[in-house]
């Protein structure tokens, strides 16, 4: 069997070593006589899996002791509702909109604000700029009394990334960040955030799991209408197991965390991600056949959208790429073109193979 280079934005490629270990343990996890999917979530075998996964994640991200790690269901999209339910507390929240996902989060919070007895403000948007850059400081309208400031630090569809949170003024308002498509791609200063959430299916593991890292002082403020299962405090008190969690997804996430540690930790992972993204961006910038329209200081290392000079060549490009073992390169339907998602599991050789194919395709069709 020959594996392809999978550039899917999510569910995305997983490290081959992780898949191999999961395959070896599918029928018998470490002598238990059954696989992880068959285990009771309250049995000692699975509780040890969860404990190790959390310990490894804490080590990778240097998570302080006053933060709780939650392994929840519903994906990042459920967090668009769960966050205001838990944090709005009858007050006001600020939202920054820099792409499709932060726009969706803002829309859901607006939808719920009235029922929660609060308000949601648009504190800055780059929609008129086509979501091709980050917000500038002078474009921000931040409320220092806001309950929280929500942002998406990597916009998967538009390929815009905030690598340095220091670009935002520190008003003392808790930062709430959707990091679904770049968490674990570089070291983080967790203490700068009140809450971080990330759908697993890009850089953590399979779909169906969302990881929430929340500062303890933000627990216990849920609206009275919040369903029990969506109350962060309740889930924290129950070790993410008020109900049956997505057990196999947590297991795979734990294997990914161990794999990241084996790569040398997040500093080494970041260096590899910079090398991969630089390789592709340098090629795009030198080409008059392909174009990336994101401002250079706003470009994502994980999701790189690009356009061909002639849209009529899109289908031949994708067909040729598939034949060359390069899959899932079609851009999101809302923006068109192509998109290469090069998460942690994508090796440098995969990006080199893509660049080689793109160079050959442009030579034949330019």
Swiss-Prot record:
Keywords, comma-separated and alphabetical: Amino-acid biosynthesis, Aminotransferase, Cytoplasm, Pyridoxal phosphate, Pyridoxine biosynthesis, Serine biosynthesis, Transferase
Cofactor: pyridoxal 5'-phosphate
UniProt record, GO biological process: L-serine biosynthetic process; pyridoxine biosynthetic process
SUPFAM superfamilies with a match to the protein in the record: PLP-dependent transferases (SSF53383)
Binding site for pyridoxal 5'-phosphate: 76-77, 101, 156, 178, 201, 243-244
GO MF assignments: O-phospho-L-serine:2-oxoglutarate aminotransferase activity; pyridoxal phosphate binding
GO CC annotation terms, alphabetical: cytoplasm
Cofactor note: Binds 1 pyridoxal phosphate per subunit.
Location(s), subcellular: Cytoplasm
Pfam families, per database record: Aminotran_5
Modified residues (N6-(pyridoxal phosphate)lysine): 202
Subunit structure: Homodimer.
Protein name in the entry: Phosphoserine aminotransferase
Organism: Aromatoleum aromaticum (strain DSM 19018 / LMG 30748 / EbN1)
Gene name tied to this protein: serC
């Amino acid at each position: 069997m020959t594996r392809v280079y999978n550039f899917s934005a999510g569910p995305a490629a997983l490290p081959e070593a992780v898949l191999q270990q999961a395959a070896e343990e599918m029928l018998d996890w470490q002598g238990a006589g059954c696989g992880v999917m068959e285990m009771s979530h309250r049995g000692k075998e699975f509780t040890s899996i969860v404990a190790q996964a959390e310990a490894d994640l804490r080590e990778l991200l240097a998570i302080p002791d006053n933060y709780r790690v939650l392994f929840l269901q519903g994906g990042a999209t459920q967090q668009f509702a769960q966050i205001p339910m838990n944090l709005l507390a009858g007050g006001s929240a600020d939202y920054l909109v820099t792409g499709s996902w932060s726009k969706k989060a803002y829309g859901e919070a607006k939808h719920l604000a009235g029922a929660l007895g609060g308000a949601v403000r648009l504190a800055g948007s780059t929609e008129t700029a086509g979501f091709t850059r980050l917000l500038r400081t002078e474009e921000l309208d931040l409320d220092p009394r806001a309950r929280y400031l929500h942002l998406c630090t990597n916009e998967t569809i538009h390929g815009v990334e905030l690598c340095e949170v220091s670009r935002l003024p520190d008003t003392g308002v808790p930062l709430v960040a959707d990091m679904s498509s770049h968490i674990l791609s570089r070291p983080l200063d967790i203490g700068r955030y009140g809450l971080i959430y990330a759908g697993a299916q890009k850089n953590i593991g399979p779909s169906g799991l969302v990881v929430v890292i929340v500062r303890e002082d933000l627990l216990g403020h849920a609206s009275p209408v919040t369903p029990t299962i969506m109350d962060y405090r309740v889930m924290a008190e129950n070790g993410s197991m008020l109900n049956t969690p997505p057990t196999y997804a947590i297991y795979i996430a734990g294997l990914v965390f161990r794999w990241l540690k084996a790569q040398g930790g997040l500093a080494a992972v970041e260096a590899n991600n910079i090398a991969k993204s630089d390789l592709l961006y340098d090629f795009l910038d030198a080409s008059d056949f392909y174009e990336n329209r994101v401002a250079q200081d706003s470009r994502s290392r994980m999701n790189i959208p690009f356009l061909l000079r002639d849209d009529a060549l899109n289908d031949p490009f994708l067909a040729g790429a598939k034949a060359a073992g390069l899959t899932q390169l079609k851009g999101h339907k809302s923006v068109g073109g192509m998109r290469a998602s090069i998460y942690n599991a994508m090796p440098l050789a995969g990006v080199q193979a893509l660049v080689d194919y793109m160079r050959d395709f442009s030579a034949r069709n330019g």
